[in-house]
C-alpha cells in the first residue's frame, strides 16, 4: 500500500510526497497562481488556486480549468480557502463577505452573503458550518 499526500505550491505545481520520504512532481497546472487546496470530490481531484479559480482532474486524468474571473456572479476572484461538502458542493471563501458555492454535478455557481445576529457580514470559514 503506497501512502502519500499531495502538496500544493507556487506557479501551479502540485507535488506528491510519499511517506517514505520521496518527493516528486505530480502535476504542473497551466497557471502562475499558488495551489492552496487539493480536495477529493465526486468529479475527481480539485486543485484550488489563490487567484486563478480551480482545476478539476477527472478519473481519466483530464484537467479542466474553471476561471472565476469569467463568472459575473463572483464578488472576488481571490480565494482564501476551500471546502467540499457532501462530495459535490465546493465552498470558496474570499476576502469579501460571503462565500461562493460551485455545484460539481450541475456546474452551477451561486453566492451566499450572510449576516450574523448583529448584522455583521459573514466571510470566514468559521462563520459557515461545513
Can you annotate each of these PLM segments?
Residues 1-130:
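Carboxylate-rich, polar loop motifs that coordinate divalent cations or form catalytic acidic clusters
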Amino acid at each position: 500500500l503506497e501512502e502519500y499526500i499531495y502538496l500544493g505550491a507556487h506557479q501551479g505545481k502540485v507535488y506528491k510526497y510519499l511517506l517514505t520520504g520521496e518527493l516528486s512532481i505530480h502535476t504542473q497546472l497551466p497557471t502562475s497562481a499558488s495551489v492552496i487546496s487539493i480536495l477529493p470530490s465526486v468529479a475527481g481531484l480539485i486543485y484550488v488556486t489563490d487567484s486563478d479559480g480551480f482545476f478539476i482532474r477527472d478519473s481519466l486524468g483530464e484537467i479542466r480549468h474553471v476561471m472565476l474571473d469569467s463568472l459575473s456572479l463572483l464578488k472576488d476572484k481571490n480565494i482564501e480557502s476551500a471546502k467540499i461538502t457532501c462530495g459535490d458542493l465546493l465552498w470558496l471563501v474570499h476576502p469579501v463577505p460571503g462565500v461562493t458555492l460551485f455545484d460539481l454535478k450541475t456546474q452551477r455557481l451561486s453566492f451566499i452573503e450572510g449576516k450574523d445576529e448583529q448584522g455583521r457580514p459573514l466571510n470566514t470559514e468559521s462563520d459557515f458550518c461545513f
